[in-house]
From Swiss-Prot:
The lineage of its organism: Bacteria, Pseudomonadati, Pseudomonadota, Betaproteobacteria, Neisseriales. Signal peptide: none annotated. It is an enzyme of class 2 (transferase). Its EC number is 2.1.1.-. One of its GO terms (biological process) is methylation. This is Ribosomal protein L11 methyltransferase. PANTHER family: ELECTRON TRANSFER FLAVOPROTEIN BETA SUBUNIT LYSINE METHYLTRANSFERASE. Keywords: Cytoplasm, Methyltransferase, S-adenosyl-L-methionine, Transferase. One of its GO terms (molecular function) is protein-lysine N-methyltransferase activity. The keyword RNA-binding does not apply. It comes from the Bacteria. It comes from Chromobacterium violaceum (strain ATCC 12472 / DSM 30191 / JCM 1249 / CCUG 213 / NBRC 12614 / NCIMB 9131 / NCTC 9757 / MK).
Length: 298
């Protein structure tokens, strides 16, 4: 089986309306992207992840899939007419059926964190069988080890865990940091996330990796203190959660923060210096890891 894929040029102001009209006209799927995607003219949607900026791209490209037997020109004309638009410029190509699962899997290779720590998709043979291999597949929750912030936290765990620590992963996403901590020798690990889906994904991933960790929503987490607290989230929540995160760290314990852009490092370090002796920041691809040691409460 094959499909016809139409690429349609559109002004961004009407792209969503035209995409909806294409679906009404018989398209199987539509997607809207920057007309300059993949070029030096591409415009970012986000600055800090999760914070939209005012500027959005001005020219869009609508990628539309049709049945192989469809009269693409007629359907595009009908959609444009429904939107009271002139016939847009477009191109059509034939897309052959593929093994989409295999194609998707081929895009995710094992990730080396260090000589002894790897992240390996479940369908892939471990490249270093004697290393600590975290089995983790791309899914609905953030955290596969490919992002610099996750990598920075994993590198810290790999180098700094001595064994038998209690660990809290605040904003656990996929559970990757809690799972890694256990496989690297931590005695216990707890993960907290505001998303129930992330809590479920973390539980599934822990089972996949043969470790026992507890994952909770914030209001269900028992009050406790830990030897190590990790929070790989974003700068804004880290600004607001300082007192809470500090309360979970034992005196002499360690805090590890990421999800921080390089230009935000000084501000966040100053905030957390209220409770911690802060270490110099570590940078990776424009992102920052901050760490510190908990002082005794006054």
């Amino acid at each position: 089986m094959a499909w016809l894929q139409a690429t349609i040029d559109s002004d961004s102001a009407v792209a969503e309306r035209l995409a909806d009209a294409l679906m009404d006209a018989g398209a199987l799927s539509t997607a809207i992207e920057d007309a300059w995607a993949g070029t030096d003219k591409e415009q970012p949607i986000f600055g800090e992840p999760g914070e939209p900026v005012d500027q959005l791209w001005s020219q869009s490209r609508i990628i539309t899939l049709f049945d192989e037997s469809a009269d693409v020109a007629l359907l595009i004309a009908a959609a444009a007419n429904a939107c009271q638009l002139a016939m847009p410029a477009y191109s059509v190509e034939r897309v052959e059926e593929q093994d989409w699962v295999r194609l998707t899997q081929s895009q995710f290779e094992p990730i080396r964190i260090s000589d002894r720590l790897w992240i390996t998709p479940t369908w892939h043979e471990a490249p270093a069988p004697n290393a600590v291999n975290l089995q983790l597949d791309p899914g609905l929750a953030f955290g596969t080890g490919s992002h610099p912030t996750t990598r920075l936290c994993l590198q810290w765990l790999d180098k700094q865990l001595q064994g038998n620590e209690s660990v809290l992963d605040y904003g656990c996403g996929s559970g990757i940091l809690a799972i890694a901590a256990l496989k690297l020798g931590a005695a216990s690990a707890v993960g907290i996330d505001i998303d129930q889906q992330a809590v479920r994904a973390s539980q599934d991933n822990a089972e996949q990796n043969g470790v026992k960790a507890d994952f909770f929503l914030p209001n269900a987490n028992p009050a406790a203190q830990y030897d190590v607290v990790l929070a790989n989230i974003l700068a804004n929540p880290l600004r607001m959660l300082g007192d809470l995160l500090a309360s979970h760290v034992k005196t002499g314990g360690r805090i590890v923060l990421s999800g921080i852009l390089a230009e935000q490092a000084d501000e966040l370090s100053a905030i957390y210096s209220q409770w911690f002796e802060m270490d110099p920041p570590v940078f990776d691809e424009g992102w920052t890891r901050l760490t510190g040691t908990r002082r005794a409460a006054v």
